[in-house]
A protein has these predicted regions:
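Conserved nucleotide-sugar donor-interacting segment of glycosyltransferase catalytic cores
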Residues: 55-128, 182
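Conserved nucleotide-sugar phosphate-binding/catalytic loop shared by glycosyltransferases and other
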Residues: 3-49, 127
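Conserved nucleotide-sugar donor-binding subdomain of glycosyltransferases
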Residues: 34-85, 90, 132-166, 170
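C-terminal "capping" alpha-helix adjacent to the active site of nucleotide-linked donor transferases
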Residues: 324-328, 336-352
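Donor-nucleotide binding loops and adjacent catalytic segments primarily
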Residues: 179-288
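Active-site-proximal region of nucleotide-activated glycan assembly enzymes
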Residues: 97-185
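A donor-sugar binding/catalytic signature common to diverse glycosyltransferases
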Residues: 76-78, 276-322
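C-terminal amphipathic helix plus adjacent low-complexity
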Residues: 343-386
Length: 386
């Protein structure tokens, strides 16, 4: 096994014991500069991100081709955002599998679409019409970007959709959804799609230890993940306000920066701020969670049966908020409304029974992502159909 990734993830991969090939070594922060925006995204920022990705793509493709020429793999597993890998696999006639932690990012044909602010599915004519218009909006936005960048795309021989009307960026062999079917209301995924289950295994559980302070009645963990650099002050401000209103509770913040894990922990009364805490380290030791609705923390809360308040910030988080709300595993609040956050927090504290959360937590363990991946690799290498 060899992992191809950016410079920032080299240490992670080596620690896991895999060989690693670093892409764009001379541009160590190239990928993070695109993904880690300094403010909430909007259509203009999405266009700029796509354009910046397009700028890197020829160089990335060239490097992957060089690696594959030197040592051609039998099969490739690619994250859904690693689009250049698909181009190279097609050129080298290598079968590949797409893994996607946000399955609803795959464009839908008949159901309620994602990435339009967090739409709830409804079953009457007007909402069906809303869904149809929203699906058209998503599709036409993609087409517009591809039209604007048609010159660059033509050089890559890229078309947005295949003959089935499905997106070409995903593998025609196999797509593994790293989530739970029980949390999803969509049923219109491509035929090669399978639910593999969440991947929440700890990578750095031993990096920073958390010792719970028994003098507090309850412990609440707060995080907004890794990528939302612009929102780190916001999560601290929310924690400060809650810690003042609820002095009997301990509030623990993680800023999600593994590279800064050794920095000093800030402890002030009932508010503790860490630069990094692994979810497998902290979640078994707390009672509740306040988070942004990212896939990693959402499924980790299910894994450890932890009720949550979700405050969607950006990207797919509004859609995860919808799914968590419908599944009754969290209360959803608005980032720009302290009143909304406090209301959701109080609701979470007052709710005594979380039956569906307990049920999903048990189902979580039935998923075996690595087993399904192994089966798919065996099937494809034995000549399984695209």
């Amino acid at each position: 096994i060899c992992v191809y990734t950016g410079f920032q993830k080299e240490e992670v991969v080596k620690k896991l014991g895999f060989s690693v090939k670093v892409l764009l070594r001379d541009k160590p922060t190239a990928f993070e500069k695109i993904s880690d925006t300094d403010r909430q995204t909007n259509p203009l920022i999405a266009y700029k991100q796509f354009k910046e990705n397009m700028g890197l793509m020829p160089e990335v493709i060239k490097e992957i081709e060089a690696f594959f020429t030197e040592n051609k793999p039998d099969i490739v597993l690619a994250d859904f955002i690693a689009v250049p890998v698909g181009f190279v696999c097609k050129k080298f006639n290598i079968p590949w599998i797409t893994s996607i932690p946000t399955p609803f990012a795959i464009e839908n044909k008949t159901t309620t679409p994602a990435y339009v602010g967090g739409l709830y599915p409804r079953n009457n004519f007007f909402f069906k019409l809303r869904d149809k218009l929203a699906r058209g909006l998503v599709r036409n936005f993609k087409k517009l970007i591809c039209f604007i960048l048609r010159k660059q795309l033509k050089e890559l021989n890229f078309t947005l959709y295949n003959e089935k009307g499905e997106e070409n960026i995903y593998s025609p062999y196999s797509i593994l959804g790293l989530g739970m079917k029980e949390l999803e209301f969509r049923d219109d995924f491509p035929s090669q799609f399978s639910w593999a289950g969440p991947c929440c295994s700890s990578l750095f559980q031993d990096s920073v230890k958390f010792v719970n302070n028994e003098k507090f009645e309850k412990s609440i963990f707060l995080t907004n993940g890794t990528h939302l650099k612009w929102a780190k002050k916001l999560i601290i401000d929310i924690a400060k306000e809650l810690s003042q209103k609820y002095p009997q509770y301990l509030f623990v913040v993680s800023l999600g920066s593994y590279l800064e894990r050794e920095k000093k922990i800030i402890k002030k009364n009932n508010l503790h701020i860490y630069h990094y805490l692994d979810y497998d380290e902290i979640l078994p030791k707390v009672d509740y969670v306040i988070h942004h609705g990212g896939a990693g923390i959402l499924y980790s809360c299910i894994k450890y049966n932890k009720p949550a308040v979700i405050i969607p910030h950006d990207y797919d988080q509004f859609d995860y908020g919808v799914r968590a709300d419908l599944a009754e595993i969290a209360f959803v609040a608005k980032l720009k409304s302290r009143k909304s956050i406090l209301k959701a927090f109080n609701k979470m504290l007052q709710k005594e029974k979380w039956d569906n959360l307990e049920k999903l937590s048990k189902i979580f363990n039935n998923y075996l992502p690595s087993e399904l991946l192994k089966k798919e690799i065996d099937r494809i290498l034995k000549g399984g159909e695209q």
